[in-house]
Structures are given as structure tokens and as C-alpha cells.
Amino acid sequence: MNDLQIEIEKIFKEAERIWDSQKYGDLKTLWDEDDPNPFYLAEEQADWKIGWDDLRKYWEPLPGKRMLEAIRMRFYDIKIKSLSDEYVFAVGWVRHDMKMRGPIKAWGGDARINALFRKKKEGWKFIAYAESHKTPVIYMQELYGKWLKIP
């Protein structure tokens, strides 16, 4: 594994730690705060969050209050492509498991991710991030593939 791969994976590990802590506002520390318009798309969102106001409202809709009883995010199978000395593109997967407060049952799933990073003095920082779930057709194909084959 090369040094750049290790550096990018460390950022994802820190994101996992922050999600686990439920101090979502701390995610901002992983982003290029000089970028006026960061892009963010979570798989459950209908549209992009663009700009710091949108990101803050997504990460901390009610500052100091937690709607989740527990959350666990795990990034895996990260692959990177250096675009220049200043930019790196990354793809991979995220596994999320969460439990909302109240009677709602826990749930989880896997989603594809991609991210764009910019090199800063203090290291690599996110400038864009997106999650994309599989389509229903792909889910069905995978389910059919798991069925026992009947002769």
C-alpha cells in the first residue's frame, strides 16, 4: 500500500471515529474549510447539500440533540486515483448501521461512495463526497444469486 493510499484511508478512519462519537459537527475538521461550496450527498437525501450552511444543517439539524441512539459507519475497499499534486479522487464502500431513538428498529446497509480531496498544508481534506445505493434491480439480481439452485 502506498503512502497516499494510507493518508486517504486515515481520513476515512477519522470519519468513522467522529460518526461513532455522534459529534457530527466535528466532521467539518476533515473538510477544506477554505472551500466556499463543499458538495455532499448522503444516500438517503433527495438532493445535494452544497455549501457550509447545508452541511451544518445536515450534520447537526438540532445542535446538541441526538436523534440516533447509535450509529456505526465503516468505510472499506477504498481505491484512489491521483488527479494531480493537489487533488485525489477516491471510491469505495460504506457500511452503516444505525438505531433511531424510539420504537424504530435498527437498520443498516452498504452504499458505494466517492470523494474528492484537496491537498492543504495540514493534509488532505474533503471537498466533495457522495454515497449511492444500489438500484432495486441490482438488489434483486443479488438476491436471486443467493437462492439455492434447484435442479
Task: Please name every model-derived segment.
Residues 108-111, 119-121, 126-151:
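Low-complexity, intrinsically disordered terminal/linker segments enriched in charged
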Residues 75-80, 95-96, 111-118, 131:
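Hydrophobic/aromatic beta-strand elements that line small-molecule binding cavities or substrate pockets
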Residues 102-104:
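Outer-membrane beta-barrel domain signature
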Residues 80-89, 117-125:
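A short, structured loop/turn motif at beta-sheet edges
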Residues 1-33, 146-151:
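Short, low-complexity N-terminal intrinsically disordered segments enriched in polar/charged residues
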Residues 48, 98-100, 134-138:
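A short local loop/turn or secondary-structure capping micro-motif enriched for an aromatic residue
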Residues 6, 24-86, 107:
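A solvent-exposed, acidic/Ser-Thr-rich amphipathic alpha-helical stretch
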Residues 86-98:
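A short hydrophobic beta-strand element
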